[in-house]
Every structure is written in C-alpha cells, then in structure tokens.
Design a protein with these regions (language model features):
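Core catalytic alpha/beta fold that binds nucleotide/phospho-ligands
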Residues: 1-127
Length: 127
C-alpha cells in the first residue's frame, strides 16, 4: 500500500527533518493499517533501513520539497518522488540511455520533456 503526505515548506523545522518525521509517521500509519502493529526501524551503516523482527515486511520512503511517500508491502518494493522542474541536458546524458533520451526529447513541449525525464528518473530511483 502507498501512503502520501504533503506539507508547506518553511516554518521552524528544517525541511529534511520534517520530511524524515513525516516519512516515519507514514510508515507507522501504514504498518498499523496493514499489519495492526509497528516495528522498530534499524539500519546498519551503508545499508537500507529495515524493520527489526519483521523479515516479511518491506517498506520504502521517499521525500522531496513538500511531498513524502511511503510504501509498505510483503515483498520487495521501491518508491521515488521528485518535483517536475527544469533539468540540465548533461544530467540526462548521465542517467538516461540513448533510447530513453529519445523518449524524453520526443516530448512536444518543455513541460512534456520535463515530465518524461522525471518519470524515467523516478522509475530508475525506485529500483
């Protein structure tokens, strides 16, 4: 299941801290809704966070500029979120294959190209 929260950037909390708190809140909400309980999140240096004692429960959290998403499932999963915005062609060359660049550049407007680029970017990041 996927859970989403939005917020207005600004205020007394640094946005990354706010996103972290919202992400963990969404995770706990999702765990309660799907499994009727929560688990402690643990993370070893350099590894992905996991739920202590919940080998059959997976989660993934992503956040960016006022948007936080969390997915919870009984199988491997991934999520990513980005705001659609202008991007540099050099970035596209680094992260997209030739056929993917063609897909992006086929967009009829700059807005369509941005949407196509970030669709690919988030798909790749979620894996």
């Amino acid at each position: 299941m996927i859970y989403l929260a939005t917020y207005e950037p600004g205020g007394s909390l640094y946005n990354r801290e706010r996103e972290h708190i919202l992400g963990r809140s969404l995770l706990n909400f999702g765990l309660m809704k799907e499994y009727g309980r929560t688990w402690e999140v643990e993370q070893e240096t350099g590894s992905k966070p996991c739920l202590k004692g919940a080998e059959d429960v997976e989660f993934n959290i992503s956040h960016t500029r006022g948007l936080v998403v969390c997915a919870v499932a009984d199988r491997a999963l991934g999520v990513d979120t980005e705001r659609i915005r202008p991007f540099k062609e050099g970035l596209m060359r680094r992260v997209c294959s030739e056929s993917e660049r063609g897909f992006v550049l086929e967009g009829r407007s700059e807005a369509a190209r941005q949407e196509r680029f970030f669709r690919l970017w988030t798909l790749k990041e979620s894996f």
